[in-house]
Amino acid sequence: MGEVYRARDTRLERTVAVKILPSHLSENPEAKQRFDREARAISSLNHPNICTLFDVGQQGGVDYLVMEFLEGETLADRLRRGPLTGEQLLKCGNEICEGLGKAHKTGVIHRDLKPGNIMLTKTGAKLMDFGLAKAVPTHETPASSLTMTLSGPSAGHPLTA
C-alpha cells in the first residue's frame, strides 16, 4: 500500500527505509487509517525479529514512517530459488515465532503473515508490514483503549487469511 524508499538519516548517520502514503491514497480515509494503524502497531514493538519504527510524521501533506532499513531478501524471493534446508527452516521458523510471540504478547495480531512480509537478513528473519495489524486486549491492555477493525471481508492474503 505504501511506497518504500531507501534514505539517509543525516542526523544519526544511518541508512533507513522511509514508507510514504502515496498522494492518491492520502485522501482515502481507509488507506490513511491503515497507514496509521501500522505506525501504532509497530511503535509498541521492540524485538530483534520485527522491523523497528524510528519515526512517524507528516511533511508537506505526505504521511511517512521512518523504519529500520533491512538488507537481505524476502522469504518469498528466497523460496523462488528452492526450498530451505531443515536447519534453515528451523532457524527461520523459530525467529518468526519469536517475533510473532512478542507482537501477540503486546496485543498486536499481524494478519498478513506471508513470505513477502518476512525479510531474511544477516542477523535473522524480521517481520515487516503491519498495515493489516489488529490490536486485541491483553491482560496488560484495557479493552477500552483498543480500536478494532471494520467488519466485512477478511484481511490479508487469500491463502493465509
Where are these regions (language model features)?
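Conserved ATP-binding/catalytic core of the eukaryotic-like protein kinase fold
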Residues: 1-161
